[in-house]
């Protein structure tokens, strides 16, 4: 399984990280196979305020996340 880290930050546009999060999360489910990706969010602080004032809690802080194979920066 590959680790996919999505870096989030204050004023991030919600669709810019939730779209890729969803795609990597459901990849492989239709075929009934094992999930090929472990997807998680990473930030400099635990709580992030998105552009529309939505409060998001990051899965990991920088330096504490599993070693990523893929890093996405919206």
Task: Describe every region a protein language model picked out.
Residues 1-74:
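Extended, subdomain-level signal for the structured scaffold at the beginning of enzyme domains
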């Amino acid at each position: 399984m590959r680790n996919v880290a999505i870096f989030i930050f204050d004023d991030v546009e919600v669709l810019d990280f939730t779209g890729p999060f969803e795609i990597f999360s459901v990849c492989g489910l239709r075929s009934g196979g094992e999930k090929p990706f472990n997807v998680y969010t990473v930030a400099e602080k635990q709580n992030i305020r998105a552009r529309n004032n939505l409060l998001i809690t990051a899965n990991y802080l920088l330096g504490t996340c599993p070693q990523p194979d893929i890093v996405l920066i919206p």
